[in-house]
Amino acid sequence: MVEKSSERFDKQMAGRLGDIDFTGVSRTRGKFVRVTSSTDPAEIYQILTKQWGLAPPHLVVALMGGDEVAQLKPWLRDTLRKGLVKAAQSTGAWILTSGLRFGITKNLGQAVRDHSLASTSPKVRVVAIGIAPWNMIQNRDLLLSAKPDHPATYPTEDLPYGAVYSLDCNHSHFILVDEDPKRPGATGEMRVKMLKHISLQRTGYGGTGSIEIPVLCLLVHGEPRILQKMYKNIQNSIPWLILAGSGGVADILVTLMDRGCWDADIVQELLINTFPDGLHSTEITSWTKLIQRILDHGHLLTVHDPEQDSELDTVILKALVKACKSQSQEAQDFLDELKLAVAWNRVDIAKSEIFSGDVQWSAQDLEEVMMEALVNDKPDFVRLFVDNGVNIKQFLTYGRLQELYCSVSEKNLLHTLLLKKNQERQAQLARKRMSGNPNNELGDRKFRFTFHEVSKVLKDFLDDTCKGFYQKLPAERMGKGRLFHSQKNLPDMDRRCEHPWRDLFLWAILQNRQEMANYFWAMGPEAVAAALVGCKIMKEMAHLATEAESARSMKNAKYEQFAMDLFSECYSNSEDRAYSLLVRKTCCWSKATVLNIATLAEAKCFFAHDGVQALLTKVWWGAMRTDTSISRLVLTFFIPPLVWTSLIKFNPEEQVSKDEGEPFAELDSLETEQALLLTDGDPVAGEGSAETAARSCSATFIRVVLRRWNRFWSAPVTVFMGNVIMYFAFLILFSYVLLLDFRPPPPYGPSAAEIILYFWVFTLVLEEIRQSFFTDEDMSILKKMKLYVEDNWNKCDMVAISLFVVGLSCRMAMSTYEAGRTVLALDFMVFTLRLIHIFAIHKQLGPKIIIVERMIKDVFFFLFFLSVWLIAYGVTTQALLHPNDPRIDWVFRRALYRPYLHIFGQIPLEEIDAAKMPDDNCTTDVQEIILGTLPPCPNIYANWLVILLLVIYLLVTNVLLLNLLIAMFSYTFQVVQENADIFWKFQRYNLIVEYHSRPALAPPFIIISHITQALLSFIKKTENTQDLLERELPSGLDQKLMTWETVQKENYLAKLEHEHRESSGERLRYTSSKVQTLLRMVGGFKDQEKRMATVETEVRYCGEVLSWIAECFHKSTLKCDRDAPKAPRSIAGSSRDQQPQGAKRQQPAGHPAYGTDKKLPFIDH
């Protein structure tokens, strides 16, 4: 239907559509259409939106009045320039004017032009549309003389007030109405019909088509003839905004609205005073009736006083809400205004005008605007909607979550990542189908992302922390990779999200919407883990961000600080529960613990927290007390029977852990919680007290002996000590074999010590295999290998073992025996350097490892600069001193090795300086030099140049470059030393985790532990052990711990809010708000003074009338049967006291009494 209508209209308008090229300074281009007064507004609207490509407006403001001869006041021009254009700019509005270059329309066009030049966003565009009568256009014949395919050239002229005017070059579109001479004013009627039609159209933010276009008329000044247009628009329920102080009809309406009385006499008096010339009595009567009818629709009238009210966009929105309130109290009727408030991001107006309590909102009413607030990044509105009834658990479905990901801006980094994953997926599907180009499937359809791409992006950022996210949805599984879900899959997307706050937090933080993400973090569960996840994502995205500003904002995100502060709040409340918070397996993050997520995010500051270090200390010492001295530990290690004495003291948990076997029903006692949370889960401790009492004393003694033995040797500190001692023994054995007992190949060797060394290395290999492949059953072998190789110390182990295997293989053959010795000697050096790893546990030596690592990186950069000078000097001196020596080994020795020795002071002057060269026999014969019979003679032709180059080389390398290296080392040391404590604590965690997971026995005895674990895995399938760093709590206790964390989070947020209120900036803002309120109150006092002055004038008028009546009765012959009543004493006394002052009082200016000029008083604005 629309297309047929368009074709019919195009035929009707053939030759009446065209472009205009404005000549002059501006040189702009516009579009025009010439219509008749009977043209359907729907067809004109179709031309604007379909043929000319204008987006449907989010607001239409029709400028009425302001085309008078009087000069515009400066403040009025500023209001229109700044206020109206700003309000239109925030939404992409249409501004309808007369389109002619005179009066206020000209000033408004200039404001639109300034906005267009300053605006950088093509989406937010202010469109100025002129609706002008054809017969009032200067040079209108030029618009008809142009060819159909060529724009009309139109000169812009500033003409004086008269019958014709030029079109304003700052307007982009014109609707030129060809009026019938028999029907004057058809242009005004066309404007009224156009506004009515636009107000019935629907548009939406985000393309939802859900909002009726709000239309508003702005009255500036205005002649009486505008009242007819105003009344017709009011009959169409279009609200009006009246600009106070602009003069004309606008001031008349403002005055009457302030007085609250619009009797005919008062209205006529105001008309006569405002327009003293050119009005007949019949016109005054007609205008008076129109004014009274207009004022009867006060709900559609709003006054804007630029001196007192807020900005114009605020007043426009209030006017629209006011018009809606007067018509209905249903929530559905306020959705358009609410959506407009969302579009303008005016949450203050939404709170004060829409959510004031007059309207009852349901969750279903707010779902649509909630989506718009999410898509358009309006966190204040999201918070407002949640506070007013939106239930996130009911609101967020997988379908809506997918729509949120599909709405990501193309300029956002997330869009690039999702697009990349989608292209990889399409390429994979194309390879399976063997169909060539993977993009053929896309066509011209709108691009959409699925959860497959989202899960892949999260996998890149969070690794196993997001395992299973959005990967098991029925729609995704049945869709088979298609971009759009089939109809039978759509109902699956209506399923509600299991963790809505987590999903929204991830969606917001992936787009770097930090304020939105902060709100979702504050509302969601497991806040410490979520903050660390946000820290990890922000760090990863900061590396990928191409724009410096985005990368800087991502790096400045304070999610690690949030995690630290919240954990501090938890730790100060309860240390035991805080420990459990660190090691419990989370529900929302794929069973990962807080410590796992912190490790993934490399949150060094979080690990440096006292609470985290206290837990690590407890884990490090195992069941032993943390105040056990090292001397006692060493003594017990070498004399194991001391473990059953009081030399080693254990924690009291072993006495409480007997309750572990009881059901997890009693959770109200803190002691019971500690027993459940902090026990090490020893199977021996799980026996009931009754069974213990029934056993014999000998059985009890054996159990205690075995328990203390197991607790001592399974502690990570004991495991570490055993590994260190045995590793030193390994290095001693290795050095002994290399130096004293490295026998020839079989049958002479190897010796018994060397065979023991081979077996020792074999146990080391078994341990490395266990660490790499026997860690997580759910992980693929390739993934396990990748994680193993990522650790630098594991790389060192792989190099050491590989060299040992190569050396052992070469050592067994006589031909490669010496090569095998060489390789094993180098391998010993690698094994010895592996000792650096044990320093990480020491508080002073641990940071030094980081310093050495950083300095090695600095050395590589230094060597680049050094090699440039070294090669330049070495090659040059070799060419100058020994041009006849063709031996390659000596060329490299003199060109590279000798200049390198110069740096350390080894300068053989007898080989460089001709004055100190010895008189030895030498030759210049190449053959003798190659045979080595005589040394080559140095060339002394340019020996002075060699000396000069040596001086420059030593100056640059020994003074400049070496001092540069020292400065780099000093800077690295200073940076690391400032954060030495943080680096050490992070290293310490990794070391504790490593030795916590290691078997109790050290190599080579570790093979016993490996055999034991293998047998247990075959017999019991799973090991019956509890990991102190990963605990899966019972559901009741886990829920209680989550509730406790939520309470601490609320306390933390309350403290943040209190600190924010007490900050100097917030206090200044609060004081400023109070001052503004006081100023508004003072402005109200002025209004009251004006009202009181009016009342005084009226009372004085009434008194004079009464005095006149009394005097008339007194002079007449009429008499009353009784005497006149006497005035009360208070009034009489007051009259006598105030009589002298009243005699001298002057009448207020602008409020004359009836007795002086016989005119009714009115308030003069």
UniProtKB/Swiss-Prot annotation:
Reactions the enzyme catalyzes: Na(+)(in) = Na(+)(out); K(+)(in) = K(+)(out)
Main location per the UniProt record: membrane
Record keyword Thylakoid present: no
Topological domains, Extracellular: 741-751, 812-818, 881-889, 931-942
Start-end of Polar residues biased regions: 1132-1141
Listed Basic and acidic residues bias regions: 1156-1165
Bilayer disposition of the protein: Multi-pass membrane protein
Keyword Membrane in record: yes
Residues annotated as transmembrane: 716-740, 752-771, 793-811, 819-841, 851-880, 943-977
Topological domains annotated Cytoplasmic: 1-715, 772-792, 842-850, 978-1165
Motif (Selectivity filter): 904-906
Comment field on protein domains: Contains two Ca(2+)-binding sites that are allosterically coupled. The binding site in the intracellular domain modulates the voltage dependence and the accessibility of Ca(2+) in the transmembrane domain.
Recorded family membership: Belongs to the transient receptor (TC 1.A.4) family. LTrpC subfamily. TRPM5 sub-subfamily.
Subunit relationships: Homotetramer.
Name of the protein in question: Transient receptor potential cation channel subfamily M member 5
Source organism phylogeny: Eukaryota, Metazoa, Chordata, Craniata, Vertebrata
GN (gene name): trpm5
